[in-house]
Amino acid sequence: MSKVHVFDHPLIQHKMTIMRKVETGTKQFRELVDEVASLMAYELTRDLPLTDVEIETPVTKTTQKMIEGKKLGIVPILRAGLGMVDGMLRMMPNVKVGHIGLYRDPETLEPTEYYLKLPTDVAERDFVVVDPMLATGGSAADAISSLKKQGAQSIKLACLCAAPEGVKRIQEEHPDVDIYLAALDEKLNDHGYIVPGLGDAGDRLFGTK
């Protein structure tokens, strides 16, 4: 079964609390999503392989560590996932970015895919699927399935806020995909929103209703 990593760093908890506040405006919300995504990227890349390299400093020659040519990819689930991309790119500027477009049916709460664009070398990359909210888990599960159908072998899921129902669905449908969260909340309400959550992340990111 996939592992669930919930980040308890004080900076992440502080920023998540401000993000949750109903009075937090679009500009600040967008900045906070970006900042938390950057902080999460630090932990998401903890297991990257290192190799020894010979370099020369202004003082002497020395052997130091660098990341060993790992191919990475970030795949935001449109549209809210876009808010996490720049923060992660700041930490991993050379990664390729794919996109998966999904919308959730307001009646069934199930996702429908309308767009998919990925790097050509899918099988050679380690992917991180990003979406601020993991509610029912339907969109994330479908996005991961789409990646696998295209040949992806290594996938992680990174979300700001999750409900236990969404985590359970990912673990059941994709037990090989580890889940990285800034917060694991209590439950879903009758409308499919995470409680206490932070509202509709897409609307709050882009100033729409």
UniProtKB/Swiss-Prot annotation:
UniProt: uracil binding residues: I194, G199, D200, A201
Superkingdom as given in the UniProt entry: Bacteria
Co-factor binding comment: Binds 1 Mg(2+) ion per subunit. The magnesium is bound as Mg-PRPP.
Biological processes per GO annotation: UMP salvage; uracil salvage
Catalytic activity: UMP + diphosphate = 5-phospho-alpha-D-ribose 1-diphosphate + uracil
UniProt entry keywords in alphabetical sequence: Allosteric enzyme, Glycosyltransferase, GTP-binding, Magnesium, Nucleotide-binding, Transferase
Gene3D superfamilies: 3.40.50.2020
UniProt note on regulation of activity: Allosterically activated by GTP.
Pfam family, one: UPRTase
UniProt keyword annotation of Transcription present: no
Cystine pairs: none
Cofactor: Mg(2+)
EC code(s) of this entry: 2.4.2.9
Gene Ontology MF annotations: GTP binding; magnesium ion binding; uracil phosphoribosyltransferase activity
Family: Belongs to the UPRTase family.
Function: Catalyzes the conversion of uracil and 5-phospho-alpha-D-ribose 1-diphosphate (PRPP) to UMP and diphosphate.
Annotated protein name in UniProt: Uracil phosphoribosyltransferase
Native organism taxonomy: Bacteria, Bacillati, Bacillota, Bacilli, Bacillales
